[in-house]
Design a protein with these regions (language model features):
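Membrane-embedded alpha-helical bundles that constitute the cytochrome b-like, heme-associated redox core
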Residues: 1-205
Length: 205
């Protein structure tokens, strides 16, 4: 009788074989620039996580008093800006390419959900600055959030809560969604361009 570990391994191999998880070649159409936005989004996320980790280790006030801290804070900010820019370009590019074709709908939806989760992650980052800017954002945002009924468990005026959300909970959710998104892409393959004619060889099976 096989154990649960064997069943789990067999299930994983059946859904995502190693040669599919880590391929050594890609279709020729992947050389198009529109396919680069996904990789650029992941690259921005890596820089974002590394700079954020350094800022977290030094504490929330470090960047106010040290030039090196201000440097890493600037790196973190621009990584966020590029992350959202590349992700929006990636989402729009895949939407106009009809990336839900060939059973890829879950991959497209996971990317869209990741974008939605990244918004409050960035919002809590602005609330964690510990300056007048973060205070103004918190006071202006609380009324809108209270009107939505989330103020009881998500209080922008509570720095500790917002810092915890920004440092741990929301980044974990974003990384998990990105990881799931990559696995779905590996499983189904990257979406081919929309065929120009009925006999086009790029038509998915």
């Amino acid at each position: 009788m096989s154990s649960w570990t064997v069943k789990l391994r067999e299930f994983g191999l059946s859904k995502l074989p190693p040669e599919q998880l880590l391929p050594d070649s890609q279709p020729a159409y992947m050389t198009s620039a529109v396919y680069l936005f996904g990789a650029l989004t992941i690259g921005s996320l890596v820089v974002l996580l590394l700079s954020g980790t350094i800022l977290a280790l030094k504490g929330p006030t470090w960047w106010h008093v040290q030039s090196l801290g201000h440097f890493f804070n600037s790196i973190h900010l621009w990584a966020v800006e590029l992350f959202f820019f590349f992700m929006v370009c990636h989402l729009w590019g895949k939407y106009w390419m009809a990336a839900w074709r060939g059973g890829r709908a879950r991959g497209l939806m996971s990317g869209a959900v990741c974008f939605l989760v990244a918004i409050p992650c960035a919002f809590t980052g602005y609330l964690s600055q510990q300056n007048f800017d973060s205070q103004w954002i918190a006071t202006q945002g609380k009324d809108g959030l209270n009107s939505l009924g989330v103020g009881a468990f998500f209080n922008p005026l509570n720095f500790g809560q917002m810092y915890s959300y920004h440092l741990l909970l929301l980044p974990l959710a974003v990384v998990a969604l990105v990881g799931g998104h990559i696995l779905l892409v590996r499983r189904h393959g990257i979406v081919p361009p929309i065929p120009l004619s009925e006999g086009d060889s790029t038509r998915p099976a």
